[in-house]
Amino acid sequence: MLHNVSKGVVYSDTALKGQDGDREGMWVGAGGALAPNTSSLFPPEPPGASSNIIPVYCALLATVVLGLLAYVAFKCWRSRKQRQQLAKARTVELGDPDRDQRHGDSSVFVDSPHGLEPCIPSQGPHADLGCRLYLHIPQQQQEEVQRLLILGEPAKGWQGLAGQLGYQAEAVETMACDQDPAYALLRDWAAQEGSGATLRVLEDALTAIGREDVVQVLSSPAEGCSVV
């Protein structure tokens, strides 16, 4: 019986030694160091493979960051250029303040009269009468002119005079809503034209619409009026 037990122990030792031999077969000694056996089913990654991927990732990340920075810089440059163009256009548009003051709101008020020559004083005892400004004649004379312009048909009234003075139809419609449209017309014309709103210009426009009666009122000197 002892013989059989010893025999079993020998077999066990032999089996264990065989398993150890199989395990050792997976590693090959090289200079005292163990290296993996290349005949394995799943060969391990070569040493340093993971460290070689890191520079690639860093290069890709740097490329993405540089692309974003370039895009932001381009957008900022383009936005600044557009603001400069808008500011330049606004400067050109507002570069003539005298023009805006002279014409006012172009959608309502008058354009410059066409074909009207500047006032040139003529010779004679009343040489300066034609060059007098409408606003410089007496108030009573102005009111009489306005009263006559309200009477009669529109073509020969203040509407026709407005057309002769260069007003557009929409401006005439706006003035028609005023309580005294003739007064509004002559006041606006005198304010817009300034030194050009002379009696000669007004008389020429009245003659063109056949209102010689109003011309006579302008030509007749009023009592107690001093020539300016």
Swiss-Prot record:
Keyword vocabulary terms for this entry: Apoptosis, Cell membrane, Glycoprotein, Membrane, Nucleus, Transmembrane, Transmembrane helix
Positions of the Death domain: 143-222
PROSITE patterns reported for this sequence: DEATH_DOMAIN
A GO CC term assigned to this protein in UniProt: nuclear envelope lumen
Gene Ontology BP terms: apoptotic process; in utero embryonic development; Rho protein signal transduction
Residues that carry a glycan: 4, 37
Protein role: Modulates NTRK1 signaling. Can activate several intracellular signaling pathways, leading to activation of JUN. Promotes translocation of SORT1 to the cell membrane, and thereby hinders lysosomal degradation of SOTR1 and promotes its interaction with NGFR. Both isoform 1 and isoform 2 promote apoptosis.
The protein's name in its UniProt record: Death domain-containing membrane protein NRADD
